[in-house]
Amino acid sequence: MTDSSNEHETENPSLPIPDNEIQDLQQEIATLKAELKEKNDKYLMVLAESENARKRMQKERQEMMQYAVENALIDFLVPIESMEKALGFASQMSDEVKNWALGFNMILQQFKQVFEEKGIVEYSSVGQKFNPFLHEAVETEETTKVPEGTIVEEFSKGYKIGERPIRVAKVKVAKAPAPQEKEEVEK
C-alpha cells in the first residue's frame, strides 16, 4: 500500500509547495523580467543609434555631393564673369561682333540657369551696408555722399546658396572723411 500511496502522491499536482521555494521562484521571475527589460532597452538603444548613424551618414553623403557640385560650379564663376565683361564691350563693336556676342550671351544665360537650378544665386552689393560675411572690403573711399560702411563699388560679384555665401563679393566701402587739421601759422 505504501507503493500505491507514493504513486498517488507524485501524480497529484496539487501538493503544497513550500513558501521559501515560491519566494525563490518569484525572485527568479522578477530577476529574469528585469534582465529582459534591460536587454530590451539596450536593444532599442542600439537600434536607435544605428538608425541615427544611418541618417547621419546619408546626410553627410548628401552634403559632400552638394559641396562637390558647389566647388565644381565655383570654378566656372571667373570665366563667366570674364565673359560678361567681354560681352559688355560688344555693343561698341561691329555688327558681326554684336551677332557673335548675341550667341555668347545665350550660352552665358544657360550657365546662369544651371547655377539657379543648383541654388546658386548672385547677390547685389552696391548701396548695401557692408557685411563681413557677404563682402570682402578691398578698398575704402572717403565720402560724405553715403553713410559710412555703405558699399559704393563692387569689383566682383558675390554668390550664395540659400543664406550661405559660397564666394563673397569684393567691394569698395565708404568711410567718413578724416577730420582736417587746422594749420597753425606762427609768425
From Swiss-Prot:
<protein>
    <recommendedName>
        <fullName>Protein GrpE</fullName>
    </recommendedName>
</protein>
<dbReference type="GO" id="GO:0051087">
    <property type="term" value="F:protein-folding chaperone binding"/>
</dbReference>
<feature type="region of interest" description="Disordered">
    <location>
        <begin position="1"/>
        <end position="21"/>
    </location>
</feature>
<dbReference type="Pfam" id="PF01025">
    <property type="entry name" value="GrpE"/>
</dbReference>
<dbReference type="InterPro" id="IPR009012">
    <property type="entry name" value="GrpE_head"/>
</dbReference>
<keyword id="KW-0346">Stress response</keyword>
<comment type="similarity">
    <text>Belongs to the GrpE family.</text>
</comment>
<dbReference type="GO" id="GO:0000774">
    <property type="term" value="F:adenyl-nucleotide exchange factor activity"/>
</dbReference>
<keyword id="KW-0143">Chaperone</keyword>
<dbReference type="GO" id="GO:0042803">
    <property type="term" value="F:protein homodimerization activity"/>
</dbReference>
<comment type="function">
    <text>Participates actively in the response to hyperosmotic and heat shock by preventing the aggregation of stress-denatured proteins, in association with DnaK and GrpE. It is the nucleotide exchange factor for DnaK and may function as a thermosensor. Unfolded proteins bind initially to DnaJ; upon interaction with the DnaJ-bound protein, DnaK hydrolyzes its bound ATP, resulting in the formation of a stable complex. GrpE releases ADP from DnaK; ATP binding to DnaK triggers the release of the substrate protein, thus completing the reaction cycle.</text>
</comment>
<dbReference type="GO" id="GO:0006457">
    <property type="term" value="P:protein folding"/>
</dbReference>
<feature type="compositionally biased region" description="Basic and acidic residues">
    <location>
        <begin position="1"/>
        <end position="11"/>
    </location>
</feature>
<dbReference type="InterPro" id="IPR000740">
    <property type="entry name" value="GrpE"/>
</dbReference>
<comment type="subunit">
    <text>Homodimer.</text>
</comment>
<dbReference type="InterPro" id="IPR013805">
    <property type="entry name" value="GrpE_coiled_coil"/>
</dbReference>
<keyword id="KW-0963">Cytoplasm</keyword>
<dbReference type="GO" id="GO:0051082">
    <property type="term" value="F:unfolded protein binding"/>
</dbReference>
<dbReference type="GO" id="GO:0005737">
    <property type="term" value="C:cytoplasm"/>
</dbReference>
